[in-house]
Amino acid sequence: MEDENASLLRVRLDGRELELGDLSRWEVGPGDSTITVLWLPTNRLKIEHTGAGDAWITNLDTATPDKVRARKIFG
């Protein structure tokens, strides 16, 4: 599956869930919510699919691109 770009709509559940501009929702991997809780709406993201709904999500708008593990749970 190809990488895709997305925009962040909102961070939910203290960083444990991301909702993207296409209304998909992603559960953030254990330990990564301390990173995503600081992400802001409209941040540009790159999604690198790794299979079976799993992906690496990179925030392209942070000083050093933050990369977290996530699993698609809706959309």
Feature map (PLM): residue ranges:
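Structural detector for short beta-strands of small beta-barrel domains
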Residues: M1-D14
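Short nucleic-acid-contacting surface segments enriched for D/E, G, S/T with interspersed K/R
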Residues: G31-E48
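Short coil-to-beta-strand transition motifs
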Residues: M1-E4, L38-P41, T64
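Short, surface-exposed beta-strand-loop junctions and turns on beta-sheet-rich folds
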Residues: S24-E27, T34, A63-P65
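Short, Lys/Arg- and Gly-enriched loop/turn segments at beta-strand edges
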Residues: A52-L60
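A short, sequence-level motif marking secondary-structure junctions
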Residues: P30-I35, R71-G75
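Short, basic/aromatic beta-hairpin or loop at an interaction surface
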Residues: V11-W26
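Short peripheral tails and domain-boundary helices/loops at the edges of structured domains
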Residues: L60-G75
